[in-house]
Every structure is written in structure tokens, then in C-alpha cells.
């Protein structure tokens, strides 16, 4: 199995359905023995430029370990979900479990 980092930008009006959507994606990954090493909900953030006349989006980060078939199924689901504005899938050499820079920044702002 390979390691991947997945970043999703989700339509801000879909925040209520976010949990159901993410549990569906988790199910796809874990269905064939895949693992989620890190999950971060970055919340609603300002976009650098408007996408579909929107200025904000809900950001989510996954670091997963799964087979290629599961990844293709996940990407197919993401592709045809209108609530997903953008998606980025990056192949990684090993599992990443420590908090991302975005989460560290959020923790500093809270303190």
C-alpha cells in the first residue's frame, strides 16, 4: 500500500453535510484495509481567488495509506461530488502523523 496526502476544498454551504461526506470517504479508504494516519479539519478559510463566485471554502486534510484501487474509487467520488470545489492528491514516501503547519498556526492563534 502507498501513502497519500489528500487536501479537499469543500463548498462552504455544505458544512452541515460535511461529516456524512467525510465518513463516506473514510469508508472507501478503510474498506480494503487502508488506514488514515492523520485527519485535520482546517475549517472555513478565505480563498486566494474566487472559485465559482465563492470567496471561502472548508478545507480538510487526510494522510492515508491505501491501495491504488481504493484511491481511484475515492478520486472518482470526489470528481463527481459538486460540493468538492478542488482536490489535491499527493503521493508520499511514508506516513505523516505530526500536525501540519496549518494546525500549528491555529493552535498558536487560540493560545
UniProtKB/Swiss-Prot annotation:
Family: Belongs to the bacterial ribosomal protein bS6 family.
Transmembrane segments: none
GO molecular function: small ribosomal subunit rRNA binding; structural constituent of ribosome
Keywords tagged on the record: Ribonucleoprotein, Ribosomal protein, RNA-binding, rRNA-binding
InterPro entries: Ribosomal_bS6, Ribosomal_bS6_sf, Ribosomal_S6_plastid/chlpt, Transl_elong_EF1B/ribsomal_bS6
GO biological process, one term: translation
Organism: Francisella philomiragia subsp. philomiragia (strain ATCC 25017 / CCUG 19701 / FSC 153 / O#319-036)
Superkingdom of source: Bacteria
Function: Binds together with bS18 to 16S ribosomal RNA.
Pfam family, one: Ribosomal_S6
Gene Ontology cellular component annotations, sorted alphabetically: cytosolic small ribosomal subunit
Protein name: Small ribosomal subunit protein bS6
Amino acid at each position: 500500500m502507498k501513502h497519500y496526502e489528500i487536501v479537499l476544498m469543500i463548498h462552504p454551504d455544505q458544512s452541515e453535510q460535511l461529516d456524512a461526506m467525510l465518513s463516506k470517504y473514510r469508508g472507501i479508504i478503510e474498506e480494503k484495509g487502508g488506514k488514515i494516519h492523520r485527519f485535520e479539519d482546517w475549517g472555513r478559510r478565505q480563498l486566494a481567488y474566487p472559485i465559482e463566485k465563492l470567496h471561502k471554502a472548508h478545507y480538510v486534510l487526510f494522510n492515508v495509506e491505501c491501495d491504488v484501487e481504493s484511491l481511484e474509487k475515492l478520486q472518482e467520488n470526489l470528481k463527481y461530488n459538486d460540493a468538492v470545489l478542488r482536490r489535491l492528491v499527493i503521493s508520499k514516501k511514508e506516513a505523516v502523523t505530526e500536525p501540519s503547519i496549518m494546525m500549528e498556526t491555529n493552535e498558536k492563534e487560540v493560545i
